[in-house]
């Protein structure tokens, strides 16, 4: 049975980890969300979230977006390539309902899988 946990090892925790991804990322974007990815040597994917107050004003909206992004990553972690991912959002993401946000994230995860296979 596949474990769908979200332990500490699956998170980007330090600024150094985020900087590594920002240096030479592969991008997958929608109008509201961008997911940056860069291969790692760990054998499993990791995720970091940057939800700026500038783009999403209300804390409960930022928390909802982070919660949905983590859940989407958790459910797709076994299909994802061993990469470090950073999720960035733009203005307008707060207007998306949960279903639309989940579908957009799923589409971007699939795009990263295709990009990883192509390279």
Curated annotation (Swiss-Prot):
It comes from the Bacteria. It catalyses: Endonucleolytic cleavage of RNA, removing 5'-extranucleotides from tRNA precursor. GO terms for cellular component: ribonuclease P complex. SUPFAM superfamilies: Ribosomal protein S5 domain 2-like. One of its GO terms (biological process) is tRNA 5'-leader removal. One of its GO terms (molecular function) is ribonuclease P activity. InterPro entries: Ribosomal_Su5_D2-typ_SF, Ribsml_uS5_D2-typ_fold_subgr, RNase_P, RNase_P_CS. Its EC number is 3.1.26.5. It holds the Pfam family Ribonuclease_P. The keyword Chloroplast does not apply. Coiled coil: none annotated. Keywords: Endonuclease, Hydrolase, Nuclease, RNA-binding, tRNA processing. PANTHER family: RIBONUCLEASE P PROTEIN COMPONENT. Consists of a catalytic RNA component (M1 or rnpB) and a protein subunit. Belongs to the RnpA family. RNaseP catalyzes the removal of the 5'-leader sequence from pre-tRNA to produce the mature 5'-terminus. It can also cleave other RNA substrates such as 4.5S RNA. The protein component plays an auxiliary but essential role in vivo by binding to the 5'-leader sequence and broadening the substrate specificity of the ribozyme. This is Ribonuclease P protein component.
